[in-house]
Amino acid sequence: MSSQTAQQLVLSDFAVDVRAGLTKPGQRELPSKYLYDEVGSELFEAICLLQEYGLTRADTRLLQRHANEIIARMPLPAHVAELGSGSGKKTRYLLEALACHRQTFYYPIEISPAALAACEKELGQLDCVSLVGYEKPYLEGLRAVAARREAQDHLCVLFLGSTIGNFDRPAADDFLRQVREVLEPGDSLLLGTDFEKDVNVQLLAYDDPVGVTAAFNLNLLARINRELGADFRLRDFRHLALWNSAERRIEMHLQSLRRQRVNIPGAALLVRMEEGETIWTESSHKYRPHEPVEMAARAGFRQIAQWVDEEWPFAQNLWIVE
C-alpha cells in the first residue's frame, strides 16, 4: 500500500468519525484519539511538563523508584508491548531494569506517527533492547506482537499514564478483557490509574492557566480544518474542563461562544451550533485505591502488586495471567 493511499484511508476514517460525532443526538462528541496528530502530540508533551499536571511526574517517579521491584514481581518477559508509548521517556527505567536480566524485544504501539518516531529516537539505542514500532490501534498492534513470540516466551503489556481513564467504566472493562484474550498464562499487564483528588486540583490539571491544554483541545478543530477543509473559527470556541461527580471523571469540551454554522466539506457536513453548545472531546475517569483489584478480576487477571505515589495519588498496578 502506498503512503498516499494509507493517508487517504486515515482521512476517510477521520471524516466518518467526525460526521458521526458531530451529528450525534443530545451531545456532540469527537473521539479523543484524534487529539493526537503531530501538533497535538507535541502539545501533550508540553502538558506533561506543566506544574499543574502532576500525573506524568507521578507515573515517572513510580517507574524510576520501583523499576527493579516491578520486574522482580512479574514472570520475566522476553517481549514488552506498550499501548500508547508517547515519547517513551518514562519507559526507559523499566527497559533498563529488564535489560540487566535478558535480551528484550520492545514494541511501542501508537496511533500517532510523531509520537512513535519520538519513542524510536528515545529508546532505539538501548543496550539489550530490540525496538519494533507499530503504528496501529492498540488491540491490533498487540495481536501482531503476540503473533511474533515463541510459545515459551512471556509478554508484558504496559498501559501507563492514565489512558485507561479515557474509557468509560464499562468500555474499560471490555477493553481489558480483550487485552486478556490476547495473553497467555505467565503474561502480565502494568496498568496506570489516576486516583480521585481535590476537585480544584483535578480541574487545574486539565485547564492550566497558561492555556496549553486549551491549545491542545482547540487543535482538534484546527485539524478538522486542515484535513477536511472545514471553516471552524477557533476564536468562536473555548476550552472547557468539567468535573462530573456522578461519573467521577474530568470532561473536556469545546464550547461554542456564539450561534454559528460550520461547513466540513471532507465529511459532507454542515453543522449548526447554538451559543453555549459543546463538543465533548475527552474524558479522564478517576479511581479509588481498591478499584484496580476489582477491575483485574473482572477482566480475567489477578493483581499481585500496587505502587502508589503519595505526592500525586496515582498507582501502577501489576496484573498477571494465571
Residue ranges and their predicted role:
Residues 112-114:
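Conserved SAM/SAH-binding beta-strand->alpha-helix loop
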Residues 166-178:
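A short, conserved alpha-helix within the catalytic core of class I
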Residues 181-198:
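Conserved beta-strand signature within the Rossmann-like core of class I S-adenosyl-L-methionine
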Residues 203-285, 289-299:
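Substrate-binding/catalytic lobe of Class I Rossmann-like enzymes that use SAM or dcSAM, i.e.
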Residues 1-34, 41:
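N-terminal auxiliary segments of SAM/dcSAM-dependent transferases
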